[in-house]
């Protein structure tokens, strides 16, 4: 399929593809999955980034959380789907141990869980940088004016991290949309 025919831009080759209901449904499902993974991955990444950058944790725990969070980036995306299949598949280790026989891990939810676990480290890295760059004096000023920790988060930290949240969402969304192997393995 090409958009350039005889030197001119045309969408004529795209129309038969979009006329097929099955192809349109695949596009819609991919966008829905990518939005869900982007949203969930950004939330989880923000929680981990906030814990590492803003909470008073021991250095070893901060290092451990950061290292474990980045592990999914080391392996290809399909390895997490294979690992989750071994754990949560029909004869999976966890389902067998829990005695759950009718649990179906394949389909949308299995793909969603696998991609979220695979791609949330991207949001973690993006948001860790954003949260580290927020000037602590702004939060200290809010505390000195009598704001509670929740109000400081709500009125200072969160608004300043919104551009990073948008960036993290777009990165996780695009990675999920581009992933072919995970839906192939877990799509059902």
Tell me the role of every PLM-derived stretch:
Residues 1-7, 19-132, 158-181, 187:
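Membrane-water interface segments at the C-terminal ends of transmembrane alpha-helices
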């Amino acid at each position: 399929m090409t958009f350039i025919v005889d030197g001119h831009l045309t969408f004529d080759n795209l129309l038969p593809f979009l006329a097929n209901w099955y192809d349109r449904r695949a596009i819609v499902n991919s966008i829905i999955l990518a939005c869900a993974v982007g949203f969930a991955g950004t939330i989880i990444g923000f929680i981990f980034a906030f814990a590492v950058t803003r909470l008073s944790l021991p250095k070893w725990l901060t290092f451990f959380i950061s290292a474990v969070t980045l592990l999914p980036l080391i392996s290809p995306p399909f390895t997490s789907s294979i690992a989750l299949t071994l754990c949560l598949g029909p004869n999976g280790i966890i389902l067998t141990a829990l005695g759950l026989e009718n649990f179906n891990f394949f389909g949308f939810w299995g793909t969603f869980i696998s991609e979220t676990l695979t791609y949330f480290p991207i949001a973690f890295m993006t948001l860790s940088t954003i949260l580290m760059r927020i000037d602590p004096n702004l939060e200290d000023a809010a505390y000195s004016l009598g704001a509670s920790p929740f109000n400081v988060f709500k009125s200072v930290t969160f608004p300043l991290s919104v551009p990073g949240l948008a960036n993290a969402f777009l990165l996780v969304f695009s990675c999920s949309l581009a992933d072919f192997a995970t839906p192939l393995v877990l799509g059902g």
